[in-house]
Amino acid sequence: MKFIHMADMHFDAPFTVLNTRSKLGEKRRLEQREAFKRIIEYIENNNIEYLFIAGDLYEDAYIRETTIEYINSLFKKIPNTKIYITPGNHDPYTINSMYSTFKWSTNVKIFKNNVETVENDAVDIYGYGFNDYYCKSSEIENIKIKNKDKINILITHGTLDGGSAPNLEYNPLNTAKLKQLGFDYIALGHIHKADYNTEENQRIVYPGSTISMGFDELGKHGVILGEIDKEKVKLEFLPIDKKEFVERKIDVTNIASVEELIEKINEEQIEKDMFYKIILVGKRNFEINTYYLYRFITEENIIKIKDETQINININELSKEINLKGLFLKEILDDKNNENIDENTAEKIIEIGLNVLK
């Protein structure tokens, strides 16, 4: 059997990181639609039997009915494909949610917050969805497979081996326990970075977010194309998002003024299919105000500027001066040398202190 496994599309997300530049958030929401349409067209053109959507298809707080109508219209274009959706923490199945109130295409099955099984001729699909924005436990690790001769698929949204306290609120799952259940494939959502291995017959998979949501999601994004039988799983990553979020560093050490820095940023080779974060590094010889820089950046695809520079001064020499500035620097250097504070903390304190003592 062949399937597409996707998750974390987050339809109608506000894309706040893009709203600093004119209408880019709005454009990104249109790109969501285009990306989803490409998935459906691929399914249609390649006779894919199953579509697994492992949660966070949309943003419950922002979703518009017109967007749901658009999604559903595409579902209707692939009537021979069985579509299974397990709601996540951003799109839980509640009494007033679109999952509950909207009339979905007949080839769509939406799971609720109890483990359900859909039996097909050769494949049984098990699913579990959120009914709230949090899910601290579920029945998943107690599932008993009904027919082990068939291909058995589990779809859910959750945190695999989460560990930290915040992740324990989003359906915490344990890899070892999941493997013991005996599923041929486990389609997960929630983690926005893809986690799959085509070489090791991996059966517990995150496809990552379908399109990148921001600078914490660098690289290519898309869906998993899978082909499975009882002996093996064949997986392929299909890039869907035509845009990427990219970080680029600029060393300011040899730049003499803010005007020269603006010129340097505007000379960067910017690709139209990328969103850029410029990270300023090195030793600076002038004050940097990122809000001021934004006003003069000509490329709208430069979304964010982060200042990680350090002030270019000879701290040891200045600490010898017989004045308040010298006494301040000597105190900080003594603390650093005695390992009372680390180097990064010392640099931050020095920078703040020197600004105060100007």
How should these model regions be labeled?
Residues 1-69, 340, 344, 348-358:
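N-terminal active-site segment of His-dependent metallophosphoesterases
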Residues 22, 50, 59-205, 209-214:
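His/Asp/Glu-rich metal-coordinating catalytic cores
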Residues 230-358:
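Accessory, non-catalytic peripheral segments of nucleic-acid enzymes
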Residues 4, 124-126, 224:
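Conserved beta-strand elements of the Class I
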Residues 119-122, 214-221, 313-316:
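Short, charged, surface-exposed secondary-structure boundary motifs
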Residues 189, 194-258:
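A conserved active-site cap/scaffold subdomain adjacent to cofactor or substrate pockets
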Residues 45-47, 147-149, 269-272:
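Glycine-rich phosphate-binding loop signature in dinucleotide/nucleotide-binding domains
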